[in-house]
Amino acid sequence: MADKITYITNLQYAQAYRVSASPRDWMRFMDTASRMYRYSFNDQLLIYGQNPNVTACATLDVWNKRFQRWVNKGSKGIALLDETGGTKRLKYIFDIANTHPGYNGEEPYIWQARQEHLGMLLAHLTETYSLPDASSLISVLEQIAEQVAEDYTDDALEGN
């Protein structure tokens, strides 16, 4: 199990470098992250690294109890790091594509960004990340990618 935890930890750092390599890589990551907005940035990196085409993810328990959906036999979960309690462990989530509805099963609500919200989105990102240029979504995302890359580079060099 320790080998798997090490592998997933290394995958997280590798994905941080990968997605910040260029605006195009960042946009690909953001496409996945936009569907995984309830997950932390680190979890989003791991989700993207293991299955960039996910639509909606949840734990086995959430699929079963909240949505009355069942994970298909043989489905491979997406490993995330769980560091609660001071010990690194793995927890697994599954994409909706790997589930099927049970009796009265629900479809989860899938969030979407709409053109009419672009102004509010730009304003929010500009304020949240203290960005100097909010002329376009591409400009804003490039600036955020630079900040994230710098943060993760510093953390990696410090050994965090």
Task: Set out the residue ranges of the language-model regions.
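N-terminal accessory/interface modules of nucleic-acid-binding and processing proteins
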Residues: 1-160
